[in-house]
UniProtKB/Swiss-Prot annotation:
Heme binds at Y36, C56, C59, H60. This is Cytochrome f. The 4 large subunits of the cytochrome b6-f complex are cytochrome b6, subunit IV (17 kDa polypeptide, petD), cytochrome f and the Rieske protein, while the 4 small subunits are PetG, PetL, PetM and PetN. The complex functions as a dimer. PROSITE patterns: CYTF. HAMAP family: Cytb6_f_cytF. SUPFAM superfamilies: Cytochrome f subunit of the cytochrome b6f complex, transmembrane anchor, Cytochrome f, large domain, Rudiment single hybrid motif. The gene is petA. Component of the cytochrome b6-f complex, which mediates electron transfer between photosystem II (PSII) and photosystem I (PSI), cyclic electron flow around PSI, and state transitions. Pfam families: Apocytochr_F_C (PF01333), Apocytochr_F_N (PF16639). It is a single-pass membrane protein.
């Protein structure tokens, strides 16, 4: 009897532990998966400004390359791949929010023409699903299905991101046409330097807010520094707070100027944007082109046969 009660108690404890762990995973997982898109989604109605600049560059200040590969042309109602490449040195480590070093994450925003959208799961081939992996894409806005975002995701695994895209059918969507369309992409690796509210992250350089002498440097218990700058003529003191992460470049007694860097710049990531073009091809135009090419080939064949027949007639007349 006692053994049965003990086993029952152990079973309840295990069930409770699993439930708590699952809740923590869901909460933290949701936060991580929404961290990159929510920054832009909360602050901007459209991720691409009128100047062509993608708004992610407002927080990720360093300029880095990004690449995109799409088919030259696609037929209506067809699933195709848009491959975004975010290259960087896999050996690099970035400063995390707690000041420690860790691996870089990546994220991307893909701005498609109106009518193009994320392909439904039942339209994606097994080969394409294998390329996509465990990535979960989402629309920038419920009404903007042509703008897709992803991230942050581990950069070492997803420096190349495959988006499954469904092309529109002008026969069903009257506002789409058989034309050449632009596609815009933005991709970042690593954390940003500025938060959406304008405040600095710990992944950037910190400058002196006043000129004077560094009279005191206090190392905080949780990391970072408090630097006291004393203005010699007036004796006014200014305290600059440095979060954990950046390395200190100044020492006590040193004379510094306004806006002089107090720390190194720990940022190893950056943001880049690019574009590509894709043609929504009319199937009738393709069929017409094939018919034209076939007719040209047949005409050439008949011309050769006619020429040989004429040569035979000439040869027979000469022999006669």
């Amino acid at each position: 009897m006692q053994t049965r009660k003990t086993l029952s108690w152990i079973k309840e404890e295990i069930t409770r532990s699993i439930s708590v762990s699952l809740m923590i995973y869901i909460i933290t997982g949701a936060y991580i998966s929404n961290a990159y898109p929510i920054f832009a989604q909360q602050g901007y109605e459209n991720p691409r400004e009128a100047t062509g600049r993608i708004v992610c560059a407002n927080c990720h200040l360093a300029n880095k390359p990004v690449g995109i590969e799409v088919p030259q042309a696609v037929l209506p109602d067809t699933v195709f791949e848009a491959v975004v490449r975010i290259p960087y040195d896999m050996q690099l480590k970035q400063v995390l929010a707690n000041g420690k070093k860790g691996a870089l994450n990546v994220g991307a925003v893909l701005i498609l023409p109106e009518g193009f959208e994320l392909a439904p799961p039942d339209r994606i081939s097994p080969e394409m699903k294998e390329k996509i992996g465990n990535l979960s894409f989402q629309s920038y806005r419920p009404a903007k299905k042509n703008i897709l975002v992803i991230g942050p995701v581990p950069g070492q695994k997803y420096s190349e991101i495959t988006f499954p895209i469904l092309s529109p059918d002008p026969a069903a969507k009257k506002d789409t046409h058989f034309l050449k369309y632009p596609i815009y992409v933005g991709g970042n690796r690593g954390r940003g330097q500025i938060y959406p509210d304008g405040s600095k992250s710990n992944n950037t350089v910190y400058n002196a807010t006043a000129a004077g002498i560094v009279s005191k440097i206090i190392r905080k218990e949780k990391g970072g520094y408090e630097i006291t700058i004393t203005d010699a003529p007036e004796g006014r003191q200014v305290i600059d707070s440095i979060p954990p992460g950046p390395e200190l470049l100044v020492s006590e007694g040193e004379s510094i100027k306004l806006d002089q860097p107090l720390t190194s710049n720990p940022n190893v990531g950056g943001f880049g944007q690019g574009d590509a073009e894709i043609v929504l091809q009319d199937p009738l135009r393709v069929q017409g082109l094939l018919f034209f090419l076939a007719s040209v080939i047949l005409a050439q064949i008949f011309l050769v046969l006619k020429k040989k027949q004429f040569e035979k007639v000439q040869l027979s007349e000469m022999n006669f």
